[in-house]
């Protein structure tokens, strides 16, 4: 009788240990293009005050999620979105340049992952991870509050979307 009960319990443990969760977000709010600093920095806009708050909220949301890897593009707004969580859990931020390479690396690693991207890359990352079109188009310019969650279990991918922080306004 003990063996019969032990087998299902063991299979559940093995199944759970093979599931990985990838959290994908767009960088938090950046300073507006009308700001004089934005004009000087053109392509590498820093986070606004609202963006700094959202980055802290992201840290609070994901601190207990056993993140082992964090990836960001090489811009200050993506790095600074990931930075509070990175410091909190002592996981360094890896820089990615190519989405296909990033997805390949994520699929080969063990552990949960945070990826910080841009309005025009988040959809591509999620869709390539799931192997399906889960996000049909680039995010809107004002969308900063989406937390996309991809669970990988063997060759299967499961997707859901949550909101975090204050709602984004158009």
How would you label these PLM feature ranges?
Residues 19-108, 122-123, 132-147, 152-170:
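Active-site-proximal alpha-helix that buttresses catalytic centers in soluble enzyme cores
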Residues 1-21:
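Bacterial Sec-dependent N-terminal signal peptides
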Residues 9, 130-133:
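Generic secondary-structure transition motif, activating predominantly at the C-termini of alpha-helices
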